[in-house]
């Protein structure tokens, strides 16, 4: 048993997400949920996001891991300096050459 303030950054992130999920909200807003987490925990976070989605709950996700975010997204928006430059389904954006080149490491 530890106080939240004594946990590592990744542990604090997991605690915050866990506390949010305990409330069983209809809308879950997550800002960079994978930030500072080990790859295994990132997988777990996105599994939980998938479960939440299957329960027909709404998630507003801000995430720099574009591939993971778009894989679970019904709808995606790509912003550059605060302006929406691309929008579409997660699947459409994953297939977009512009998104692949700019955010997924593909060569244009």
Please annotate each region the language model reported:
Residues 1-108:
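Glycine-rich phosphate-binding loops of nucleotide-dependent enzymes
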